[in-house]
Amino acid sequence: YLNLFKFKNMIFQKEIILPSFPRGFHLITNYIKNELPRMTGIINVFIKHTSASLTINENADPTVRIDFETHFNVMVPETANHFLHTLEGSDDMTSHIKSSLLGSSVDIPINNGNLLLGTWQGIYLCEHRNEGGARQIVITVNGEE
């Protein structure tokens, strides 16, 4: 039995500017961990861009990152000639599609400021542009101290 009335719900929110990463899949778990308050609840990690995305996946074997990038480039090739939205380059429309496939946010339970990820799980920034630049991430924690 959980007495929900004894808890005082709080919201914590912070924007993080990630450095520019090359195209590919990059672990950003530590960037998130370093900003977590000592709260218990749920964290939402949201990226404020349409050409990069976030996902949670295996963090141990670096070849996973290479396989992800390779597979997404096969699934959504830049050489496809049916894209109309190409003003910003051949990687523009494909980056929007890849971002839509993976999503712009992840939710993770936290306990006392610790991410409750599985042993082999990490948070990835999926950079779909050749020159994506710095990326803005918003973390929002809904929970209690």
What do the PLM-derived regions correspond to, one by one?
Residues 5-145:
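Active-site histidine-anchored catalytic micro-motif
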